[in-house]
């Protein structure tokens, strides 16, 4: 039976999968609760760490020794520190039957990203140039009896042709100037000016 534990760090957007071979619930419970590590009592299994995201540094460190009827619990640690996850296993000698230090394995996952040259997918999209038909209609009017400011403007654009008219009260306050104009690509700007009495 294989046990997969997904390690996820949301702030870095990286995910790693820890695969553990071998045995039963003792190893799984121990790994998640602080004991057990990567080996069950009396059985050695091989662990591997698979990086699934860009920028994960994976290191594996082994200790020496072996033997003993069981493994010591000291030295097993799981902690998240400084942008990486460190899983430690191993420890002192077993309780009976043999002397040497237990096998110590040390797994480390960091999120540096500076050592990897992973390809970056670059998608070049073809630009779509749409030519919209320019069209608008605008007009405004001002009639201020206190300052004697009277003016108006009306303009319509259809494609590249613009036509409109504007009028304003002359400084003598008796005459209104009216300008009718047309503008297009062929003829340019053509204006016709006329005057009428203000009433």
UniProtKB/Swiss-Prot annotation:
Summed up, the tissue specificity of this protein is: Epidermal regions synthesizing hard cuticle.
State the signal peptide span: 1-19
Domain Chitin-binding type R&R as annotated: residue spans:
133-199
Instruction: List the coiled-coil residues.
Output: none
Instruction: Select a single GO molecular function from the record's annotations and give it.
Output: structural constituent of cuticle
Q: Where does the record place Gly residues bias?
A: 82-102
Q: Where is this region: Disordered?
A: 63-103
Task: State the superkingdom.
Answer: Eukaryota
Q: One Pfam family for this entry, by name?
A: Chitin_bind_4
Per the entry, induction is:
By 20-hydroxyecdysone.
Q: Which UniProt keywords apply?
A: Cuticle, Signal
GO CC, sorted alphabetically, is: extracellular matrix; extracellular space
Function, as annotated, reads: Cuticular proteins play a significant role in determining the physical properties of cuticles.
Q: Which PANTHER family match?
A: CUTICULAR PROTEIN 62BB, ISOFORM A, STRUCTURAL CONTITUENT OF CUTICLE
Name of the protein this chain belongs to: Adult-specific cuticular protein ACP-22
Species per Swiss-Prot/TrEMBL record: Tenebrio molitor
Starting at the broadest rank, the lineage of the source organism is: Eukaryota, Metazoa, Ecdysozoa, Arthropoda, Hexapoda
**Gene transcribed to yield this protein:** ACP22
């Amino acid at each position: 039976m294989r046990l997969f534990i997904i390690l996820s760090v949301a702030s870095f957007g990286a995910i790693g999968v820890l695969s553990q071979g071998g045995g039963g619930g003792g190893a799984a419970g121990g790994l998640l609760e602080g004991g057990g590590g990567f080996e069950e009592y009396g059985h050695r299994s091989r662990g591997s760490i698979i990086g699934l995201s860009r920028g994960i540094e994976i290191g594996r460190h082994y200790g020496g020794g072996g033997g003993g009827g069981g493994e010591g619990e000291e030295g097993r640690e799981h902690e998240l520190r400084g942008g990486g996850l460190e899983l430690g296993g191993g420890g002192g000698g077993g309780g009976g039957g043999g002397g040497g230090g237990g096998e110590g394995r040390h797994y480390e996952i960091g999120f540096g990203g500076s050592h990897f040259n992973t390809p970056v997918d670059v998608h070049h999209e073809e630009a779509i140039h749409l030519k919209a038909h320019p069209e608008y209609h605008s007009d405004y009017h001002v009639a201020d009896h206190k300052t004697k400011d009277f003016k108006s403007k009306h303009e319509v654009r259809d494609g590249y042709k613009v036509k409109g008219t504007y009028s304003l009260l002359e400084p003598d306050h008796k005459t209104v100037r009216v300008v009718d104009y047309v503008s297009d690509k062929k003829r340019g700007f053509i204006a016709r000016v006329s005057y009428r009495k203000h009433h």
